[in-house]
């Protein structure tokens, strides 16, 4: 499969027709850098062929907008990855003065649902948490009870309004966590790899929150967690990500703060027969992506390494 260079973006690894991009000027990556992108393209395509399921990937270089796309506009179940949008709406309402992250909430018996998390081990009627604490549980251990508390607090319709304001029309919060009846009726939380990437990029570029809330948003999203993107990456590298898992579904989407070459990677899979294989594929794609960006961030235009590994935020 060939690759093409479009306006301000290099688009690789698409199944079928290439997606059109609009911009005002033409920009091409240096020839040797293009070869690295092509090698990454080949790697991603190989993982896609070997996976017994459907895989979608978007990789965005935040320093120059070069992008790799595989099934990037296919709609996938988000599982817990949708929680990055719930978190953003919480922070947006805090910025607007509609709530404070330090507001407290008393855990109720009716809040408790199954699945991942630790709220079920806490004492209802007694346990008090700040809204930021509730958000931390939602992100760090993917607590479904905590997530539903926040959905009630910020409003499902407001999460979708935020997505609409960014023209993300395929990314939807349609139900609470563990609402099996809603899922069976087809009200699934969904997104595309491209739109989740665009969502994180909008946050990174300050288009959703001011600097104070943007910084804290990514601090919370960078909480270490069991996930796929960091598995093959250095432990001291800042990674703001949120995985998601359902039966037949494995996802992970995040921003890797790789010094002068930060990037976003979003990988989603569905119709997966072997979930472990899908998670392993996402981890390998993430590892190969990091190794390319690490070389680019530390090398001269000729490829000679001229600086040590940089894990600082740009």
What is the role of each PLM region?
Residues 54, 127, 148-200, 204-205:
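Mid-domain, small-residue-enriched loop/turn segments at the edges of structured enzyme/sensor domains
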Residues 26-50, 153, 198-227, 234, ...:
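Structured C-terminal helix/loop/strand segments within mature extracytoplasmic catalytic/sensor domains
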Residues 62-63, 101-119, 154-155, 220, ...:
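Acidic helix-start/capping segments at beta-turn-to-alpha-helix junctions
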Residues 65, 76-105, 265:
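Active-site SXXK
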Residues 112-148:
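Conserved catalytic neighborhood of penicillin-recognizing serine enzymes
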Residues 1-10:
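Bacterial N-terminal signal peptides that target proteins for export
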Residues 9-19:
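Bacterial N-terminal signal peptides
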Residues 37-72:
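A short, well-structured edge-of-sheet supersecondary motif
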